[in-house]
């Protein structure tokens, strides 16, 4: 298995690196704790663990490159990176730009509210009332959900999650819609101790890695690695380490 994966990855990277086996360039966004985030100068998180496990199977190093979420796809298209590993939800729009691997996790959007408003927004129909001021992370699938599915909201799109949560803390918006993978972690931090994640999915989404559309060999190699990691129980172990809270199903 390891030799086959190494061969596939060598073929996938030969065109870009002139045949040399160089580090796998992994694009991440550090706005998504616990997906990828800094502790001092060290990157940690779900995707960091996965990337390192990939490297172990390939006897090669990983080069992490940090971007804003809405810059990741452009970086991939311009061959600045080889793969996006940033808890990316699979959508038809994104699939038109990249090749997705097989999914490794199911997730969804959740509402984050101020603690004093939690009872009100937990009521049936509270999130479907018209005219809510809703914060989102610009370019994330949460923004698409809010604009398409919510009832005529005033949408505030922020360049980072922390900026959006700051707006929620300061009552600029009524709630913030964000990915369940990181919502509970974000609201458990000291700075956000007056915020609460409503632990219920608003959507269901598949999460996968993304490679350049002209690189099917790398897609195949990563799918082989993913299958082996699932078989060995490593995917579930990583997710359990970083995601102790399981949201309520739709």
Language-model-derived ranges and their functions:
Residues 13-14:
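N-terminal signal peptide c-region/cleavage motif recognized by signal peptidases
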Residues 19-88, 92, 96, 241-242:
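Extracytoplasmic small-molecule ligand-binding "clamshell" domains
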Residues 24-28, 124-139:
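Short loop->beta-strand "edge-of-pocket" segments that line small-molecule binding or catalytic clefts
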Residues 29-30, 106-113, 180, 184-227, ...:
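Periplasmic-binding protein-like
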Residues 63-74, 156-170, 205:
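Short helix-initiation/N-cap motifs at beta->coil->alpha
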Residues 71-74, 86-96, 148, 169, ...:
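A ligand-binding cleft/hinge motif common to bilobed small-molecule-binding domains
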Residues 101, 114-133:
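Flexible hinge/capping segments at coil-to-helix
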Residues 141-155, 194-197, 227-250:
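Ligand-binding clefts/hinges and TM-proximal coupling segments of bilobed small-molecule sensing domains
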């Amino acid at each position: 298995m390891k030799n086959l994966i190494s061969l596939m990855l060598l073929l996938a990277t030969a065109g870009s690196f002139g045949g040399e086996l160089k580090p796998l360039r992994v694009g991440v966004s550090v706005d998504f704790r616990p997906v990828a985030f800094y502790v001092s100068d060290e990157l940690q998180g779900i995707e960091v663990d996965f990337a390192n496990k990939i490297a172990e199977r390939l006897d090669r190093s990983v080069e992490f490159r940090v971007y804003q979420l809405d810059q990741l796809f452009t970086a991939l298209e311009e061959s600045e990176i080889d793969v996006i590993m940033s808890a990316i939800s699979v959508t038809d729009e994104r699939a038109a730009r990249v090749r997705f691997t097989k999914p490794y996790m199911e997730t969804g959007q959740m509402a984050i509210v101020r603690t004093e408003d939690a009872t009100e927004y937990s009521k049936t129909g509270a999130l479907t009332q018209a005219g809510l001021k809703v914060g989102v992370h610009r370019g994330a699938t949460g923004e698409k959900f809010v604009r398409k599915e919510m009832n005529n909201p005033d949408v505030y799109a922020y360049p980072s999650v922390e900026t959006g949560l700051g707006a929620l803390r300061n009552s600029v918006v009524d709630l913030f819609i964000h990915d369940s993978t990181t919502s509970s972690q974000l609201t458990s931090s000291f700075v956000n101790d007056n915020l609460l994640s409503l632990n219920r999915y608003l959507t269901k989404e598949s999460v996968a890695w993304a490679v350049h559309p002209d690189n099917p060999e790398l897609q195949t190699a990563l799918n082989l690695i993913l299958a082996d990691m699932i078989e060995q129980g490593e995917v579930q172990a990583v997710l359990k380490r970083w995601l102790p809270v399981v949201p309520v199903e739709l």
